[in-house]
Amino acid sequence: GHKRFCMWRDCQCKKCSLIAERQRVMAAQVALRRQQAQEEELGISHPIPLPSAPKLFVKKENNGGSSCLLLESSSPTHSTNTATTASTTPSEGRMLIQDIPSITSRGHLESTSDLVVDSTYYSSFYQPSLYPYYNNLYNYSQYQMAVASDSSSSDMGGTLAGSPVKNSLRSLPATYMSSQSGNQWQMKSTESRHAMSSQYRMHSY
């Protein structure tokens, strides 16, 4: 009978004090989560972590410049004065080509580590359980584009530039469906579009 008639917030017995303490801890956890969510929202538009990437670019470019200078100074020892200009320019070009991908890859990795929070934040907006047909429409549009560009690349005659494009585009729609059932997919997508629009109207009001 104590449980039914007791005000557990004001009661001093062991059981009620434990319940009150647990409620306080849960409220503190909820407050912490809200604060973290607000900090993440502010962190999206916060410009503080961004300048670290340009600094890396500058450092990497400086390193690349010094290595080019080293190559220029070492190349005249191996060749004559007439061949120095010919030997230094290709080494410069090669060093720059080698340095540029490493710069972009490093900057990309650091920027993605900053953007991991953003992806989780944006994923909370999109709920695929409410609109199960919405994802199919996006897949269908990508598949349609891939088929169009695939046919255009095959018209090129299988050139060197067209073949990697073909392979990359073919791997993209392969996860969604096979190319044989294209007409069936088209029928399904039109039906799902109607169903999605009616469902979307129901939810929007």
From Swiss-Prot:
Location within or outside the cell: Nucleus
Main location: nucleus
Highest taxon listed in the record's lineage: Eukaryota
DNA-binding region: 1-29
GO cellular-component term (any): nucleus
Protein family according to the UniProt entry: Belongs to the DMRT family.
Function: May be required for testis development.
Protein name: Doublesex- and mab-3-related transcription factor 1
The gene coding this protein: DMRT1
